[in-house]
């Protein structure tokens, strides 16, 4: 194991325990108190960052804009953050538009958390992809029951972004779509 690999492994191990506890605590408190939607996007202390600060700022800005668009129930604002060739396990932009539209019809005060533990750039130039390893959740108040409902959650999921029109946009997943997901996993379609 090289020094770089060992460092990355150690960073993930330390982060995993703390972030797991913190994420569970935040989600539990959020669900238990029924508070209004609130979004947090945070770069974990000790996160593995393999890009320059300008790129980190641009990536964080994408998720801050997503948080704001969700809070405002701004469907066009959310869609503007997705790449034109978005593809996540076969879901395209039209599918994501429908999912978010349905969520806004069923829930109010949507909010969530994103804890980033790694930001890495793969490739270069127009083929560059940013991989953001993230743990988080999304919840909302049901318009039917007025109860806070967990909508989506993920642990060490990877958000993929591509440079399009000079800005980073959420692009889905990279490579082949697995025919069957591993036991205990589910696709994370919302980002």
Give residue spans per PLM region.
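Beta-strand elements of well-folded, non-transmembrane domains
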Residues: 136-142, 161-163, 178
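Low-complexity, intrinsically disordered terminal/linker segments enriched in charged
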Residues: 155, 162-191
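Bacterial N-terminal signal peptides
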Residues: 19-32
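N-terminal secretory signal peptides that target proteins for export/translocation
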Residues: 1-15
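A short gly/proline-enriched turn/hairpin at secondary-structure junctions
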Residues: 81-95
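Short, low-complexity N-terminal intrinsically disordered segments enriched in polar/charged residues
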Residues: 36-80, 102, 118
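Surface-exposed, charged secondary-structure patches
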Residues: 101-154
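Flexible low-complexity loop/turn motifs enriched in small/helix-breaking residues
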Residues: 55-58, 71-77, 81-83, 109, ...
